[in-house]
From Swiss-Prot:
It comes from Enterococcus faecalis (strain ATCC 700802 / V583). It catalyses: IMP + NH4(+) + NADP(+) = GMP + NADPH + 2 H(+). This is GMP reductase. The lineage of its organism: Bacteria, Bacillati, Bacillota, Bacilli, Lactobacillales. Its EC number is 1.7.1.7. GO terms for cellular component: cytosol; GMP reductase complex. The gene is guaC.
Length: 325
């Protein structure tokens, strides 16, 4: 199997057929809904909160609310449904989550999307939860993860998952690869390609995205949707603490399995970093969309489908050659 990551690959351009990149359509469909871009901010505590979720939904973007404030989930679903907005939440696999799903079914609170979100998703615990969700909330689109192998994708799809989330530990604040020796860190793009070949349903690429070009590369290698943490962290609206050092403003960003999220030092597979303040989230979303429109124009098409068909090369030394924006 060819092993490579985002920075080892360059996509090869095709003849451009549009007069302006603004003609290129970045929309994507996942389940019963279409969204402005194939991008979703990570369901992490320093990336998304209820206010950001609402803003994203109002503006046609996909979102997944994190699962770290369990009590807030029912009121959140009610509020979003009252506003006529898409509801998309996360669940874990512990005992209490089964009762939570039953409560939703009993109260007629049917979310549009539920993401089963654990670090090692190729497990009986996840398979059991998929089956429980499908039985209790048959109308809900179920995303399950995280996984890193074709076997895992097939097994979760067969259990009833409507989409699988691929990526074990490639994220910027994830240290699974260091703490355990396992994961897709350093070969996330190849893992995505490997999994996508086996998938019959959509795949969400999760982790390792460091540039906007990586979104196009993810689409090329089989992703329907791309989950992004660090590029969405550090904005004005981002949850989390702010600090000022030597006149520079920083915001915190920590992993979902870090001691900062858990509140204890137990099975820690995440860390905390401070990122330079990036301004408004809306500006980043606009820039991301414009860059993706440019990617489509380089691919020689008018929509995301064009990117899926382009040729690519694997470059021996990193394409960035030390360059940063």
């Amino acid at each position: 199997m060819k092993v490579f990551d985002y920075e080892d690959v360059q996509l090869i351009p095709n003849k451009c057929i549009v007069n302006s990149r603004s003609e290129c359509d970045t929309t994507v469909t996942l389940g019963k809904h279409s969204f402005k871009m194939p991008v979703v901010p990570a369901n992490m505590q320093t990336i998304i909160d209820e206010t950001i979720a609402e803003t994203l939904a109002e503006n046609g973007y996909f979102y997944i609310m994190h699962r770290f404030d369990e009590e807030a989930r029912v009121p959140f679903i009610k509020k979003m449904q009252q506003k006529g907005l898409i509801t998309s939440i996360s669940v874990g696999v512990k005992e209490g989550e089964y009762a939570f799903v039953e409560t939703l079914a009993r109260e007629g609170l049917v979310p549009d999307y539920v993401t089963i979100d654990i670090a090692h998703g190729h497990s009986n615990a996840v398979i059991n939860m998929i089956q429980h969700l499908k039985k209790s909330l048959p109308e809900t689109f179920v995303i399950a993860g995280n996984v890193g192998t074709p076997e895992a994708v097939r097994e979760l799809e067969n259990a009833g998952a409507d989409a699988t989330k691929v990526g074990i530990g490639p994220g910027k604040v994830c240290i699974t690869k260091i703490k355990t020796g396992f994961g897709t860190g350093g070969w996330q793009l190849a893992a995505l390609r490997w999994c996508a070949k086996a998938a019959r349903k959509p795949i969400i690429a999760d982790g390792g995205i460091r540039t906007h070009g990586d979104i196009a590369k993810s689409v090329r290698f089989g992703a329907t949707m791309v989950m992004i943490g660090s590029l969405f962290a550090g904005h004005e609206e981002s949850p989390g603490e702010t600090k000022v050092e030597d006149g520079v403003v920083y915001k915190e960003y920590f992993g979902s399995a870090s001691e900062f999220q858990k509140g204890e030092k137990k099975n820690v597979e995440g860390k905390k970093i401070w990122l330079r303040h990036k301004g408004k989230l809306a500006d980043t979303l606009v820039e991301m969309q414009q860059d993706l429109q440019s990617s489509i124009s380089y691919a020689g098409g008018r929509d995301l489908e064009a990117i899926r068909k382009v040729d690519y090369v694997i470059v021996k030394n990193s394409i960035f050659n030390g360059d940063t924006i």
